[in-house]
């Protein structure tokens, strides 16, 4: 936070008593930072079906069929692919949802997050 001091001179209550003189008013201005962003990544494996990966991308990352297919092929060909960029809490939730869903469907799909 940044502090700003404002000095005001004058008389209060119109007299020469203890109420007259200089008044210092301190105001603080909050300094906000943008939150750190995290990439959510899918990792390739030899067992998870491509259709399941596309379904995950559509369900948890709201990707259309073309984008989901493109990302899935990138994961397949390069070993890793980015699903999206989110704040820490959102990225953590997405990773957890994907991992739970993969386990429920008995697939070894791995999803991780890394700071951008």
From Swiss-Prot:
Renumbered residue ranges of the record's region Disordered: 1-23
Biased composition (Polar residues): 1-11
InterPro entries: ClpS, ClpS_core, Ribosomal_bL12_C/ClpS-like
An annotated GO BP: proteolysis
UniProt superkingdom: Bacteria
Pfam families, sorted: ClpS (PF02617)
Known partners and oligomeric status: Binds to the N-terminal domain of the chaperone ClpA.
NCBIfam families membership: PRK00033.1-2, PRK00033.1-5
Protein task: Involved in the modulation of the specificity of the ClpAP-mediated ATP-dependent protein degradation.
PANTHER family, per database record: ATP-DEPENDENT CLP PROTEASE ADAPTER PROTEIN CLPS (PTHR33473:SF19), ATP-DEPENDENT CLP PROTEASE ADAPTER PROTEIN CLPS1, CHLOROPLASTIC (PTHR33473)
HAMAP family hit by this protein: ClpS
Family: Belongs to the ClpS family.
Protein name (record): ATP-dependent Clp protease adapter protein ClpS
Source species: Brucella canis (strain ATCC 23365 / NCTC 10854 / RM-666)
Gene, per the UniProt record: clpS
């Amino acid at each position: 936070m940044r502090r700003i001091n404002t000095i005001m001179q004058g008389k209060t209550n119109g007299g020469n008593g203890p109420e007259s003189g200089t008044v210092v008013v301190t105001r603080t201005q909050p300094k906000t930072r943008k939150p750190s962003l995290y990439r959510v990544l899918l990792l390739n494996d030899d067992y998870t079906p491509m259709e399941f990966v596309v379904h995950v991308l559509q369900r948890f990352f709201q990707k259309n069929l073309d984008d989901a297919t493109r990302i899935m092929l990138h994961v397949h060909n390069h070993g890793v692919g980015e699903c999206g960029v989110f704040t820490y809490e959102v990225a953590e939730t997405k990773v957890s949802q994907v991992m739970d869903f993969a386990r429920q469907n008995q697939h070894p799909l791995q999803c991780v997050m890394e700071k951008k």
